């Protein structure tokens, strides 16, 4: 299985990068993992509604340009469906069973995702109704993917 994690902005926090690197290493035993960061759009601190839409549109175009046409796209969004770790594992396993060997997870920037990204997404996934820094969500996503593969293989994982 090929999994791509696409996100907006460069990861700056060293401790988050270290955590992601650890989970990428662990995940390499189960799947081919690719991490792609697209530049965030520079914007003034106080944005109008139209400015926010334009920023999300530009960031969305950068994200969409990196997704292959045959990828199953899961966008992380507050309004998405929440799943247990077991449900996420089953979902990933079923995608592989039904021939979806390329999965792309998309994490938006600080303003969220554009309507075009939502339109391209095959599924919306939420980890919480709370808002989290997108860089922290990347670490959480990597951990949940690792946990999912351990669950799929019936391997123990510390709870």
Swiss-Prot record:
S-adenosyl-L-methionine binds at residues 76, 108, 127-132. One of its GO terms (cellular component) is cytoplasm. The keyword RNA-binding does not apply. Keywords: Cytoplasm, Methyltransferase, rRNA processing, S-adenosyl-L-methionine, Transferase. It comes from the Bacteria. CDD domains: RlmH-like (cd18081). Coiled coil: none annotated. Specifically methylates the pseudouridine at position 1915 (m3Psi1915) in 23S rRNA. This is Ribosomal RNA large subunit methyltransferase H. It comes from Shouchella clausii (strain KSM-K16) (Alkalihalobacillus clausii). The gene is rlmH.
């Amino acid at each position: 299985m090929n999994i791509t994690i696409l996100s907006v902005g460069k990861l700056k926090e060293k401790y988050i990068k270290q955590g992601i690197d650890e989970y990428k290493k662990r995940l390499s035993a189960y799947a081919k993992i690719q991490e792609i960061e697209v530049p965030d759009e520079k914007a003034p601190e106080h944005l109008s509604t139209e400015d926010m839409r334009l920023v999300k549109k530009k960031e969305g175009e950068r994200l969409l340009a990196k997704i292959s046409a045959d990828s199953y796209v899961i966008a992380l969004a507050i309004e998405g469906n929440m799943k247990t770790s077991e449900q996420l594992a089953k979902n990933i396993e079923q995608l592989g069973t039904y021939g979806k060997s390329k999965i792309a997870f998309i994490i938006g920037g600080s303003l969220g995702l554009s309507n075009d990204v939502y339109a391209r997404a095959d599924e919306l996934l939420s980890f919480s109704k709370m808002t989290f820094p997108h860089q922290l969500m990347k670490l959480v996503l990597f951990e949940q993917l690792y946990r999912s593969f351990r669950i799929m293989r019936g391997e123990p994982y510390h709870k």
